[in-house]
Curated annotation (Swiss-Prot):
Annotated protein name in UniProt: Uncharacterized protein CXorf58
Organism field: Homo sapiens
Superkingdom, taxonomy of origin: Eukaryota
UniProt region (Disordered), positions on chain: 306-332
PANTHER family in alphabetical order: FAMILY WITH SEQUENCE SIMILARITY 90, MEMBER A1B, NADH DEHYDROGENASE (UBIQUINONE) 1 BETA SUBCOMPLEX, 4
Length: 332
């Protein structure tokens, strides 16, 4: 009777332990899934915050670069060109030359870099560019004379250069122009081609950081976009420059701030130095422990010698407190 009654109890205990183990496994699996889900949500949240912050900083940098490019085009064109090409700056300053310099953004990645190009206004009359490629016809005697003067090697090198350029740009001559798009491509090729091959050599040129005067806030803006390091001068003006210009006067004032020439910050030092006692003087440089001990011994020896010399030179005093001097003794 007792044996038969113990059998189902053992089966119940075994089934109970198995069910508890299954419950624990399910609980642990759910806990692991919850932890992995929580970590995944944290990563997604961090990525969202990073993207939002990067987009905010990119918009801020682009707005500052827009101020810099507008200030360069309307206020400090001559100062910048004087650093890039002094001869071209002198030519553009001539009132008879109706030139205009345009600044634009260029680049495949952010932040973009600034480029500039010189445009010549002709009021619809146009200018004639003389080059040997356009003037000398292939079947003329002038070509034979040019070959004799230049030499066959140099002459053939120029011809091979034209053949090399043609596959890159199909429109390299006025005879290749058929449509308006071909004419635009020909003008672009004519501007970018070097002068020795018959072009204008007037392409878009990159404006480097060295070409911008350091005394302008424009230099700090370009340096901040390239390196990510902001200067104190730019930080002080950042709040006003990032404001949306409601009126034209506010926009002009922002451009004046960017293009304003400011002197470097000077730290005024006193003309004299206050006297320092010997124990307050700090020795510059680094010394080893052995050198310090050697200096300390030498100092003690020097002080001891100085003390002995002072005792020898100083006259002795008698018991009455008067100095013993044989010149003052009375002879009886």
């Amino acid at each position: 009777m007792n044996r038969s009654s113990n059998v189902p109890r053992k089966g119940i205990l075994k089934s109970g332990t198995r069910s508890l183990q299954k419950v624990r496994r399910v609980h642990f699996a759910n806990a692991r899934n919850a932890r992995s889900l929580l970590s995944m949500l944290k990563d997604i949240s961090a990525q969202i915050i990073q993207r939002a912050w990067l987009s905010h900083t990119n918009k801020m940098i682009f707005r500052l670069l827009k101020h810099a490019i507008c200030a360069a085009e309307f206020y400090v064109t001559h100062e910048i060109l004087k650093k890039v090409a002094p001869l071209e700056a002198k030519l553009i300053k001539d009132p008879t030359m109706q030139c205009k310099i345009r600044f634009r953004f260029r680049g495949e990645t952010f932040p973009p870099f600034i480029v500039f190009k010189i445009f010549l206004h002709t009021d619809g009359h146009g200018y004639k560019y003389f080059s040997g490629k356009n003037v000398l016809m292939p079947s003329s005697k002038a070509v034979d004379d040019a070959c004799k003067l230049m030499g066959e090697r140099k002459f053939h090198r120029i011809i091979m250069e034209d053949e090399r350029i043609f596959p890159k740009s199909k429109v390299t001559d006025i005879m290749d122009v058929v449509t308006m798009q071909d004419y635009v491509q020909y003008r672009s090729f004519f501007d970018e081609a070097p002068a020795f091959s018959g072009g204008r050599n007037n392409s878009w040129r990159k404006l480097n950081l060295e070409n911008i005067p350091r005394t302008m806030l424009m230099y700090d803006i370009v340096h901040y976009s390239e390196s990510g390091v902001i200067s104190n001068r730019l930080r002080n003006e950042m709040k006003f420059l990032l404001q949306r210009p409601v009126t034209q006067e506010i926009h002009k004032h922002q451009l004046r701030i960017v293009s304003e020439i400011r002197g470097p910050y000077l730290t005024v030092q006193p003309l004299y130095r206050p006297y320092k006692q010997q124990n307050q003087v700090k020795f510059l440089g680094r010394r080893s422990k052995q050198a310090q001990m050697k200096v300390e011994k030498m100092r003690k020896v020097y002080l001891a010698k100085e003390k002995n010399t002072s005792e020898v030179t100083e006259p002795k005093t008698g018991p009455s407190g008067t100095k013993d001097n044989y010149h003052l003794h009375s002879i009886f």
